[in-house]
Amino acid sequence: ESALGVQLFSRTARGVTLTAEGSVLYDYAAQALSLLEAGEERIAQSRELLKGELSIGVSSTLTKYYLLPFLRDYHQQYPHIHVRILNGTSRRVLQLLGSGQVELAFATYTPDADSFSVFPCFDTHTVFVAAPDYPCDFDRVYTLQEISEFPLILLEREASSRRFREDCFLQRGLRLQPEIELASHNLLISLARIGLGVAGVTEELSLSGLNRGVVRKLHLAEEIPSRRVVLCTRRNTPPSAAAGRFMEMIRANHGFDRPAEQDG
């Protein structure tokens, strides 16, 4: 009362009642306490994964060929968590992570170590495939120059895997000039299997077509360097309970315990 300079209570021999000013303050205080209780309940629900959101940035290819089993198991265990997937190239999903639009991002190149914590998941390898009846010799070993002379089917230039493969060939003085450029990794296999050319694909994401024999690998005289798929988080920003639990599922599959060491 002395701090506000008004009388909040009316005191009589029968007891204490609120004044008009006291009633106004009581209404605001009751609302504040109600909001505080709601906030505490929301935090408790988030901690117990009864509510919340999991936001992930990842390419559509990795979503289909890698993340689907994890997303299925996560949803079965935590059905009340809203899962939000934002698709894009590695560069794009790392931008989303850096701006806080997603909590987790899967990328196929190592980002800035000062901004992100990086956890290795698995390595990928480039192979060139064609239909079994394509006019080439699957028993022969081809040089990279000979590969570059085939009618090539590649991902569009914006894809990080396309840029990586182009760089590998450029380092050897070779330029890739594809006959067909696509936005979908899945379509690479589809067009190769009908004989439209030789497709440059990620082997680990093409096992279905390879195992079924709809396409076959060409043998290379020189192996193209592998690439690593990594899980990234914002450095010095603890993940939410929902994101942390998803990371535990990924960790159980790949065994990482700490961020990967960065070169340099």
Predicted regions and their residues:
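A short LG(V/I)-centered, amphipathic sequence patch enriched
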Residues: 1-18
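Alpha-helical linker/hinge and terminal dimerization helices associated
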Residues: 3-4, 25-47, 257
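Short amphipathic alpha-helical coupling segments at ligand-binding clamshell hinges
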Residues: 21, 25-28, 66, 70, ...
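A late-sequence structural motif
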Residues: 66, 129, 216-259
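Hydrophobic hinge/microswitch elements
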Residues: 89-94, 98-102, 107-108, 160-218
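Flexible hinge/capping segments at coil-to-helix
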Residues: 113-152
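Secondary-structure junction motif
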Residues: 136-137, 151-172, 239-248, 254-262
